Amino acid sequence: MKYYADDQATLYLGDALEVLRALPDGSINCCVTSPPYFGLRDYGVAGQIGAEASPAEFVAALVAVFAEVRRVLADDGTLWLNLGDSYASGSSNNGGYSAKSTL
C-alpha cells in the first residue's frame, strides 16, 4: 500500500512480497530496505521474515523478496540494502543455530 507520495518519491508500507508483486516490471528507481535478522525479534506478524524455522528458510524468504525487487527495478535502478550479520557479532539467539553449521 502507498504510505506516502509526492512528485519526487513514493513510499510503500506493507508485506514486502505483496507490495512488490503489485508493482509493474521496471517501475522502481530505488529500493531502500533493512530486512529483519533471523531469530532476533518477533514483530507479532504472521509470516514475518526472520521468524523462519531455519536459516535456510530465512535465506529462501530473502531470495524471494529480492527476486521481486530485481523485477521491479528499472534497468538503471539501485538497491540500498542494510543487512547485518548477527551471527558474527554474537548478538542474537539465532534460533539455537550455531554460526558454523547454519548455511
Regions found by a protein language model. Name each.
Residues M1-L103:
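S-adenosyl-L-methionine-dependent nucleic acid methyltransferase catalytic domains
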